[in-house]
Amino acid sequence: MLDLQPSDRRHGAPSSSGGVSGGDELIRTYKGWKGNNVFFLGGRLVFGPDARSILITVFLITAPVIVFCIFVGRKFIDDFPHHRGVSVLAVAVGLILLDLVFLLLTSARDPGIIPRNLYPPEPESNEGNGEPRLAHTPQSRLPRTKDMIVNGITVKIKYCDTCMLYRPPRASHCSICNNCVEKFDHHCPWLGQCIGLRNYRFYFMFVLCSTLLCIYVHVFCWIYVKRIMDSENINIWKSFLKTPASIALIIYTFICVWFVGGLTCFHLYLMSTNQSTYENFRYRYDRHENPFNKGIVGNFMEVFCTNVAVSQNSFREKVSKEPAIPPRTVNGGMSSPSLQKVSNDIEMGRKPVWHETVEEELGDIEKDMEAGVASRDLSRMLPPEESEGRGIMHSRESSRGRGIMHSRESSRGRRGGSWELSSRVNEDLRTRDESVSRVGEDSSESSDNDASRDLHVEIYDAVTSRGRTGTGIGRL
């Protein structure tokens, strides 16, 4: 069974030494948060990135109730003895206050965010499979999924590249909030927040209260229309003209109740089967047994009768402003810089750009080749007899090294196949021909001189043909 204990290398977690180093600047965790959340009151309230949509939701709830209380509910005060008609207004106000409280509890709390790791987990060792490993081999690729046993049923858990962790069962990564959320249900655009383990019950109560509020306003608007019909002995159409506010509320609540009422029934079904909206839409348990199903009673008790899970994040805790990522070791050796750079890119929420690493490696190779080309001048320091014997060989090696180098330099920073090498190659060949001619004059072997000239022509033809075909290092 796979162990999923929380890692001590999570973002914002204190170090094992008891805190951060004394020289680092300390900030609150929420100020350096890498997700897209919006924080208020010093990190005490946690909203999603689209928190402004809450204002629209509040308006759609409160505006109809205000209209109801002014134009409809107030008319019922004198219709009951001992001013019992005030209870009509009191119930409406109570429902809307309860609805707004559940809205705040849903949208302003941590939905169950899983803290992200500072770097990827250690790869599984190959011990026991007979495959030898070198001390400085590159870091192996992490498997995309792993198996975990839940109530005797195998469940696959996935690796999150952004958070650099294996997500627990039923968790998923929200692309809007940029967080992994435990028991992820969905991201609600009306509340601007993810719905997960820590706020699902409050979300359901919010939807239920909204449904009851719509039904309540809808019913009492019809009662008020009926009261006008009976008191003035007119038909329903004329009564509508007497109270246009009631007609508007009847139409509005009728439309809304189809949405919030249908949502309430849908989540009642999900709770009875212990599913999430995300799991239901993916048809995850259509052909497989649900390992989390505890029966109807057990499922409802799990939602409403259990303690709210403690948040894994301390948003007000002081941490280092930019925590340094310690270098990884692979079997006792330090990891390569390219792997460390990829880890940093993932931690910053950015996909690794592989061509940057390639350009760095090409830069190192280019420096080595420059050093190799510069060594041709050492022949001038040799004794005359050795210089004469090695002149032709040295010119050949120099022409090869510089030919490759020029092709790389001319292609650097270009995307197409236009190399434009002719002018630079001609100049280099002219310089080398002069050098070879001097060596040929000192040497009695004229045949070697002719062979060297033929070699330069072949190099020129090969380089220009590579430029026309668009192949070579420049195509990287």
Curated annotation (Swiss-Prot):
<feature type="compositionally biased region" description="Basic and acidic residues">
    <location>
        <begin position="425"/>
        <end position="441"/>
    </location>
</feature>
<feature type="region of interest" description="Disordered">
    <location>
        <begin position="373"/>
        <end position="454"/>
    </location>
</feature>
<feature type="region of interest" description="Disordered">
    <location>
        <begin position="119"/>
        <end position="138"/>
    </location>
</feature>
<protein>
    <recommendedName>
        <fullName>Probable protein S-acyltransferase 5</fullName>
        <ecNumber>2.3.1.225</ecNumber>
    </recommendedName>
</protein>
<dbReference type="InterPro" id="IPR001594">
    <property type="entry name" value="Palmitoyltrfase_DHHC"/>
</dbReference>
<feature type="compositionally biased region" description="Basic and acidic residues">
    <location>
        <begin position="387"/>
        <end position="412"/>
    </location>
</feature>
<dbReference type="Pfam" id="PF01529">
    <property type="entry name" value="DHHC"/>
</dbReference>
<feature type="active site" description="S-palmitoyl cysteine intermediate">
    <location>
        <position position="188"/>
    </location>
</feature>
<keyword id="KW-0564">Palmitate</keyword>
<keyword id="KW-1133">Transmembrane helix</keyword>
<feature type="transmembrane region" description="Helical">
    <location>
        <begin position="246"/>
        <end position="266"/>
    </location>
</feature>
<keyword id="KW-0472">Membrane</keyword>
<feature type="modified residue" description="Phosphoserine">
    <location>
        <position position="336"/>
    </location>
</feature>
<feature type="domain" description="DHHC">
    <location>
        <begin position="158"/>
        <end position="208"/>
    </location>
</feature>
<keyword id="KW-0012">Acyltransferase</keyword>
<feature type="transmembrane region" description="Helical">
    <location>
        <begin position="85"/>
        <end position="105"/>
    </location>
</feature>
<feature type="modified residue" description="Phosphoserine">
    <location>
        <position position="418"/>
    </location>
</feature>
<feature type="compositionally biased region" description="Basic and acidic residues">
    <location>
        <begin position="1"/>
        <end position="11"/>
    </location>
</feature>
<feature type="transmembrane region" description="Helical">
    <location>
        <begin position="53"/>
        <end position="73"/>
    </location>
</feature>
<dbReference type="GO" id="GO:0019706">
    <property type="term" value="F:protein-cysteine S-palmitoyltransferase activity"/>
</dbReference>
<feature type="region of interest" description="Disordered">
    <location>
        <begin position="1"/>
        <end position="21"/>
    </location>
</feature>
<comment type="similarity">
    <text>Belongs to the DHHC palmitoyltransferase family.</text>
</comment>
<comment type="function">
    <text>Palmitoyl acyltransferase.</text>
</comment>
<keyword id="KW-0449">Lipoprotein</keyword>
<dbReference type="InterPro" id="IPR039859">
    <property type="entry name" value="PFA4/ZDH16/20/ERF2-like"/>
</dbReference>
<feature type="region of interest" description="Disordered">
    <location>
        <begin position="320"/>
        <end position="340"/>
    </location>
</feature>
<keyword id="KW-1003">Cell membrane</keyword>
<keyword id="KW-0812">Transmembrane</keyword>
<keyword id="KW-0597">Phosphoprotein</keyword>
<dbReference type="GO" id="GO:0005886">
    <property type="term" value="C:plasma membrane"/>
</dbReference>
<feature type="transmembrane region" description="Helical">
    <location>
        <begin position="209"/>
        <end position="223"/>
    </location>
</feature>
<keyword id="KW-0808">Transferase</keyword>
